Curated annotation (Swiss-Prot):
The RecF protein is involved in DNA metabolism; it is required for DNA replication and normal SOS inducibility. RecF binds preferentially to single-stranded, linear DNA. It also seems to bind ATP. The gene is recF. It comes from Geobacillus sp. (strain WCH70). One of its GO terms (cellular component) is cytoplasm. This is DNA replication and repair protein RecF. PROSITE patterns: RECF_1, RECF_2.
Amino acid sequence: MFLTHLSLKNYRNYESETIEFANNVNIILGENAQGKTNMMEAIYVLAMAKSHRTTNDKDLIRWDEDYAKIEGKAMKKNGALSLELIISKKGKKAKCNHIEQQRLSQYVGHLNIVMFAPEDLNLVKGSPQVRRRFVDMEIGQVSPVYIHDLSQYQKLLQQRNHYLKMLQTREQQDETVLDILTEQLIPLAAKITLKRYEFLLLLQKWAAPIHHEISRGLETLQIQYRPSVDVSEKIELSRIIEAYSEKFATIKEREIQRGMTLAGPHRDDIAFSVNGKDVQIFGSQGQQRTTALSIKLAEIELIFSEIGDYPILLLDDVLSELDDFRQTHLLDTIRKKVQTFVTTTSIEGIEHDIIKEAAIYKVHSGHITAPLCD
């Protein structure tokens, strides 16, 4: 798939900009704080209906304006795609091919994106929350049902935590409501756990050979899912439901004492190991970067295997974080099959062959030029 057109209105530091893109490589050139990352974020938000940089949608709206608007046109293997997202202080409205979407879960997944930015190194060395968010965003691109289940789970989790807090402070003493909330939570927790497990098995399948190649055959990557309940390769939904039921029965009194839900997908983690050693704890910076790069390249292949179309790749100021070998491997892998957006302050560090093929744009103070000539 290719993003051919992007229009921004009142988005971050962009007042009103429209730009046409090339199908291969698009290099966004400019000094820091001019709007390069904001444009990459806008493409990401157009696809995912949320930012990877902030959880507050108000941050996306230009100062002193009431709303931001992102419009995009893309070509997919099954035809043209038109997307529109309006972000206001009251919420978001989304349209796909000019039809308003009743839920954002219906909207996400039409345009598929893989983002690789310096902060993605935190996927390996950051908190479990970073890894859970990564998994949720990637599954959500190919499974609208997952987004809906996750949203329902988070609402029930909030209600359950609130009631546990009331039981803890003796504001409530009747545990009946807690039991009802637990019964409603368990099937959703089980479905999320199963989907994450299946996704990580696929990610392992694609990432391991990529990592092996990037490490010149010296390293073996393993991805291990660490959920709140035990899972195995032959796990079934009914068995996960049973495991959660037993878990919540066992920890009920402890949850009341703590005033919070102590098991569920919100407490999951993912571990990455190289040659049997945890990369987060024992890995060098080079191994952590190779792991992050392998996972991002695996995402591209995984999405293609699921939908039959390559996603769009966003490389936001990340090439400078990779050595020449990793950069060359990345660019050779994606060349001519994945539409790629690259932000940089200078084209000097980018391979000459890539520059020859690329459309180069200049960003300055929230304004984008047409493609530059060599």
